[in-house]
Amino acid sequence: MASGQQERSELDRMAREGETVVPGGTGGKSLEAQEHLADGRSRGGETRKEQLGEEGYREMGRKGGLSTMEESGGERAAREGIEIDESKFKTKS
């Protein structure tokens, strides 16, 4: 059990030095903070998926995947003639 604690201490030290040690924990200043950030981000995505439904969530991902630093996904889709069905984005009542 002590090795588990040592490992957590090492990960915490790395996190305090600015390294991301938990997937999805970017921006956390400690191991615990990164764990909380990752958990919240995951839960937020699941909630959004429930609100939009599988199809809407997938369509929104397509649009987001088209975005670049220079233009939004919507701008790029319009420019390249890619059809994005935004009616699928509506939340389920």
Swiss-Prot record:
Keyword Nucleotide-binding: no
Pfam families, alphabetized: LEA_5
A GO biological process held by the record: response to abscisic acid
Residue spans of biased composition, Basic and acidic residues class: 7-19, 32-62, 73-93
Keywords, comma-separated and alphabetical: Stress response
Record has Chaperone as a keyword: no
Domain of life of the source: Eukaryota
Induction details: By abscisic acid (ABA) and osmotic stress.
Region named Disordered: 1-93
Family from the record: Belongs to the small hydrophilic plant seed protein family.
Function: It is thought to provide protection for the cytoplasm during the desiccation stage of embryo development.
Miscellaneous comment text of the record: Wheat contains at least 10 different genes for Em protein.
Protein known as: Em protein H5
Taxonomic placement: Eukaryota, Viridiplantae, Streptophyta, Embryophyta, Tracheophyta
